[in-house]
């Protein structure tokens, strides 16, 4: 019985620290130092939330740049079902999926080069990836330009404007947030 009191005291102390103080402290500091990130990195237009800078969206129209395929369950880019397809490189089903994606992209982009960028046919580990490389966006320019009646120069400048460089040049590669790029496309039409 003598050992019960210190054990119970330690349990209550740790419960208060890990279940109350620590979460409250991290929430307050997160809201104070990183309010945009702590609230989901939401992209707003006026009072309307158009998406998150962290999660891709399923853009299917010819007038939009398309991101990486999503491997999430039920619907594409479902944040509640995040996860990869878990198909190994040696799995024939993965080969079939990639071949189907390549064929669909070539059919939708007849004026683009025949070399489809790899990130447009392979899903990310989370299934929610919102970034593609500037090269993958540039590959889609002929289709988007034709659908929106824009010049190749306009779209090339837009891609350059929305390209994000890595923090350290030799670690990583430039990327484009597909949600922000497509929202910028919609603003060009206004």
Curated annotation (Swiss-Prot):
Main subcellular localisation: membrane
Record localization: Cell inner membrane
One Gene Ontology cellular component annotation held by this UniProt entry: plasma membrane
Keyword Transport on entry: yes
S-S bridge residues: none
Topology relative to the membrane: Single-pass membrane protein
GO molecular function, one term: ATP binding
InterPro entries the UniProt entry points to: KdpC (IPR003820)
Residues passing through the membrane, by range: 10-30
Subunit structure: The system is composed of three essential subunits: KdpA, KdpB and KdpC.
Functional note: Part of the high-affinity ATP-driven potassium transport (or Kdp) system, which catalyzes the hydrolysis of ATP coupled with the electrogenic transport of potassium into the cytoplasm. This subunit acts as a catalytic chaperone that increases the ATP-binding affinity of the ATP-hydrolyzing subunit KdpB by the formation of a transient KdpB/KdpC/ATP ternary complex.
Family: Belongs to the KdpC family.
Listed name of the protein: Potassium-transporting ATPase KdpC subunit
């Amino acid at each position: 019985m003598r050992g019960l009191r210190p054990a119970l005291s330690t349990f209550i102390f740790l419960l208060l620290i890990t279940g109350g103080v620590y979460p409250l402290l991290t929430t307050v500091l997160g809201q104070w130092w990183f309010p945009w990130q702590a609230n989901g990195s939401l992209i707003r237009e006026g009072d309307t939330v158009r998406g998150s800078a962290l999660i891709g969206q399923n853009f299917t129209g010819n007038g939009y740049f398309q991101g990486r395929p999503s491997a999430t369950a039920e619907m594409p880019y479902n944040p509640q079902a995040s996860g990869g397809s878990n198909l190994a490189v040696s799995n024939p089903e993965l080969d079939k999926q990639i071949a189907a994606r390549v064929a669909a992209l070539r059919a939708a982009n007849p004026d683009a080069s025949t070399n489809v960028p790899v990130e447009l046919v392979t899903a990310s580990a989370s299934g929610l990836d919102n970034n593609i490389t500037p090269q993958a966006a540039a590959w889609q320019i002929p289709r988007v330009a034709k659908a929106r009646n824009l010049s190749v120069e306009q779209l090339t400048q837009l891609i350059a404007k929305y390209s994000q460089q890595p923090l350290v040049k030799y670690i990583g590669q430039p990327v484009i947030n597909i949600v922000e790029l497509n929202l910028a496309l919609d603003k060009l039409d206004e």
